[in-house]
Swiss-Prot record:
Taxonomic source organism: Pyrococcus furiosus (strain ATCC 43587 / DSM 3638 / JCM 8422 / Vc1)
Protein name in UniProt: Protein archease
Keywords, comma-separated and alphabetical: Calcium, Metal-binding, tRNA processing
Protein family per UniProt: Belongs to the archease family.
SUPFAM superfamilies tied to this protein: MTH1598-like
GO MF annotation list: calcium ion binding
InterPro entries xrefs: Archease, Archease_arc, Archease_dom, Archease_dom_sf
């Protein structure tokens, strides 16, 4: 089961995602990211975008995934409210393939909150918890 939350971090907002699988944790932290930007509960699945990124390790993979989503928000004007991803390790690197579901940003509908300027490695953690679930977190640049 995917879950996400924001957490206090000095003057910034931390985002954290949980899942029964690594993929669910990545999906959940992406939801947390977009809930910093808008009210994700108001986003409809009107567009489906294919996502494919890779990284040398899980941290760089998470960075690349969220950076791609933020790019699509900034350049294409899209907001996302759901994700389905698969992660595999191949030839010494991690590959994430999946889909992001959302729609064009509408300030009247989506209730804008904060502007996320960039994804960072600040306070980034990806770990398996004692209960077997996965957690992914970081502090984006607001």
């Amino acid at each position: 089961m995917r879950q996400w939350e924001h957490y206090e971090h000095t003057a910034d907002i931390g985002i954290r995602g949980y899942g029964d699988t690594l993929e669910e944790a990545f999906e959940a932290v992406a939801l947390a990211l977009f809930d910093v930007i808008v009210n994700v509960r108001k986003i409809e699945k009107k567009v489906e975008i294919d996502i494919e990124v890779e990284g040398e390790d899980l941290e760089s993979l998470l960075y690349s995934f969220l950076e791609e989503l933020l790019y699509l928000h900034d350049i294409e004007g899209l907001v996302f409210g759901d994700f389905k991803v698969k992660i595999e390790q191949k030839d010494g690197k991690y590959i994430l393939r999946g889909k992001a579901y959302g729609e064009k940003f509408d300030p009247e509908k989506h209730e804008p909150k904060e502007e996320v300027k960039a994804i960072t490695y600040h306070d980034m953690k990806i770990e398996r918890l004692p209960d077997g679930r996965w957690m992914a977190q970081l502090v984006p640049d607001i």
